[in-house]
């Protein structure tokens, strides 16, 4: 799981 910070919203992406 890679957590990317987009703006102020933490989005969890499955890679």
Curated annotation (Swiss-Prot):
Enzyme class, spelled out: transferase
Keyword list (alphabetical) reads: Amino-acid biosynthesis, Cysteine biosynthesis, Pyridoxal phosphate, Transferase
Q: Could you tell me the EC number(s) of this protein?
A: 2.5.1.47
| Lineage per the UniProt record | Bacteria, Bacillati, Bacillota, Clostridia, Eubacteriales
Family in the record: Belongs to the cysteine synthase/cystathionine beta-synthase family.
Reaction catalysed by this chain? O-acetyl-L-serine + hydrogen sulfide = L-cysteine + acetate
Q: What is this protein called?
A: Cysteine synthase
Residues annotated as coiled-coil are: none
Q: What does the subunit comment say?
A: Homodimer.
Q: Which GO terms describe its molecular function?
A: cysteine synthase activity
Q: Does the keyword Cell cycle apply?
A: no
Task: Report the cofactors.
Answer: pyridoxal 5'-phosphate
Q: Please give the pathway this protein is involved in.
A: Amino-acid biosynthesis; L-cysteine biosynthesis; L-cysteine from L-serine: step 2/2
Membrane-traversing stretches? none
Q: Say yes or no: keyword Zinc present.
A: no
């Amino acid at each position: 799981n890679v957590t990317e910070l987009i703006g102020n919203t933490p989005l969890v992406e499955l890679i």
